[in-house]
């Protein structure tokens, strides 16, 4: 399946809300048919975002870049050793619903947390978990943090590697 990349030691440079962030988003696990994986060994999208944009906007960019059709719950995990690290800070959707247990474990709400607030550095990685039932796990590598964004609309997908997997696999068809 898609390789989980190991990144070099983080550089000293951190970002802010004025900076431009370049992320490589890799699918590291999920309900992928073997026939699809054989044809698409690496599945990634490179996305650029401004530091004043939110994690919700990053989610929407990933959702669109991988051509997903149905929304599901998701979270970002930042500050750990990559995706699935239980020690990472979790940023979740909709903390206003009064779920005290959820609020206690979440570091923030994706709709209010801006990219520049995360404190990520170049060459760091963080996780994105989409669809808590089907468990699509992604590793997001911070490829670059530039002083300021150029003109144009952001978020912006700048590179696609591999085809977008179907959101739902027809396992009956796969067995034939």
Give residue spans per PLM region.
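Short linear regulatory motifs enriched in tryptophan with gly/pro/ser
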Residues: 1-176
């Amino acid at each position: 399946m898609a390789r989980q990349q190991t990144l070099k030691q983080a550089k000293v440079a951190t970002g802010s809300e004025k900076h431009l962030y370049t992320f490589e988003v890799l699918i590291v696990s999920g309900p992928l048919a073997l026939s699809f994986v054989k044809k698409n060994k690496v599945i990634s999208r490179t996305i650029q975002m401004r530091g004043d944009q939110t994690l919700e906007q990053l989610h929407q960019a990933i959702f669109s870049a991988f051509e997903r059709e149905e929304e599901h719950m998701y979270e970002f995990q930042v500050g750990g050793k990559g995706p699935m690290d239980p020690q990472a800070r979790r940023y979740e959707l909709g903390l206003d619903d009064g779920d005290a247990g959820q609020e206690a474990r979440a570091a923030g709400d994706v709709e209010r947390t801006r990219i520049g607030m995360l404190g990520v550095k170049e060459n760091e990685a963080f996780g994105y978990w989409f669809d808590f039932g089907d468990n699509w796990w992604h590793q997001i590598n911070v490829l670059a943090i530039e002083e300021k964004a150029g003109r144009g609309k952001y978020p912006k997908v700048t590179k696609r590697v591999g085809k977008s997997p179907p959101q739902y696999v027809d396992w009956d068809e796969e067995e034939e």
